[in-house]
Regions:
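RNA-contacting regions in translation and RNA-metabolism proteins
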Residues: 1-169
Length: 169
């Protein structure tokens, strides 16, 4: 498994001087280190994880966001048992995100497994912008408990102020 920290550090749980320096200078975050160590620990027990590349990690509240390559996201989402194992390892809610994705794709990852019908950027008279996302009523019922988390994650990670519009079926 490829991670933001070197393989030896991810396996041993301690940082070498090079990775320690990257952490100190801000090239790495504590979440990158934690995510790398936990996923490497899991990859020792599950060979499917060896093929993946973790680009970076972020934490928003109790939620852990793991940013992978686009091809890795599809693979992970097709393996429900593997996803459950990852969530157990991180002791909570894990969001799989595509690294370096444009805002629309970022929002699609947050709203997964439902589909976003429309997304529009609205410029308000006071100068700030709001992104409006449209979902169907049927889909909204699947994620209604997560909407506040989705809004908070979008705001903290990409500075997207989100407005969710629900359309009747």
């Amino acid at each position: 498994m490829k991670t933001p920290i070197c393989t030896f550090d991810a396996r041993s749980g301690t940082l070498c001087s090079l990775c320690e320096n990257k952490l100190r200078t801000g090239q790495l975050t504590q979440e990158d280190v934690e995510g790398s160590i936990r996923l490497t620990k899991l990859s020792a027990r599950n060979q499917d994880l060896d093929k993946l590349t973790l680009v970076n990690s972020k934490r928003v509240g109790d939620d852990f966001l793991l940013f992978f390559r686009a091809s890795d996201i599809n693979f992970l989402r097709s393996k429900e048992i593997l996803m459950n194992t990852i969530e157990e390892e991180f002791h909570g809610n894990v969001w799989l995100m595509e690294a370096d994705s444009p805002p629309r794709k970022f929002l699609e990852n947050l709203f997964f497994p439902i589909r976003i019908g429309n997304s529009n950027m609205i410029w308000l008279p006071d100068g700030h912008k709001v992104t409006q996302v449209t979902v169907t009523n049927k889909d909204y019922s699947k994620i209604s408990g997560k909407v506040d988390k989705i809004k908070r994650i979008a705001e903290e990670i990409k500075e997207i102020e989100l407005l969710v519009q629900v359309l009747g079926d």
